[in-house]
Amino acid sequence: MQKSVDPAEGITTYKILPGEFYVTKDNERIETVLGSCISACVRDPVTGVGGMNHFMLPVDKNATGASELSDANRYGNYAMENLVNALLNAGARRERLEFKLFGGGRIMSSTTNIGWYNIGFAFDYIYTEGFKIVSQDIGDVYPRKILYYPNSGRVRVRRLNAMHNQSLAAEESRYINNIGSKPVEGDVELF
């Protein structure tokens, strides 16, 4: 995660990469660039506590039980639970959480449509858990740059040109290949 200050807005910005999430109560901005990945921007509108995650794959298909929980930064099932838990620990109330979904583009046309699986997972998770989606910009063939202001709930989305697709696709392929080589570790509370 990279921290910087945007001089134009005078706001602290956190740039998250695949497998990361960030939660804040402060007047900060969280940003990321998405291809087939999904980001959920989630907040409690009463407390202003909000956060964003960025995940590459829907679920860890190798996990068969609590002893095999994977690193929370790899898969959507753990990324969503960890984001929600961090929001609750920061003072958000579960029944007030609002979800905004972004990404899931098909930017790698020669491979499996990972974005489609990510979108399906995100919808299943949100509806199964009883949360509500208040906004979305998902699917299609475009990568996206997301700027999220958790205090206000405002999101700015820029659809990027196709020329960004090749570098983003290469980055996503490297990330997918590295996931399987990392040891299973981490702790997550599934509720």
Curated annotation (Swiss-Prot):
Its EC number is 3.5.1.44. Keywords: Chemotaxis, Hydrolase. Coiled coil: none annotated. InterPro entries: CheD-like_sf, Chemorcpt_Glu_NH3ase_CheD, Cytotoxic_necrot_fac-like_cat. It is an enzyme of class 3 (hydrolase). GO terms for molecular function: protein-glutamine glutaminase activity. One of its GO terms (biological process) is chemotaxis. SUPFAM superfamilies: CNF1/YfiH-like putative cysteine hydrolases. It catalyses: L-glutaminyl-[protein] + H2O = L-glutamyl-[protein] + NH4(+). Probably deamidates glutamine residues to glutamate on methyl-accepting chemotaxis receptors (MCPs), playing an important role in chemotaxis. Belongs to the CheD family. NCBIfam families: PRK13487.1. This is Probable chemoreceptor glutamine deamidase CheD. It comes from Hydrogenovibrio crunogenus (strain DSM 25203 / XCL-2).
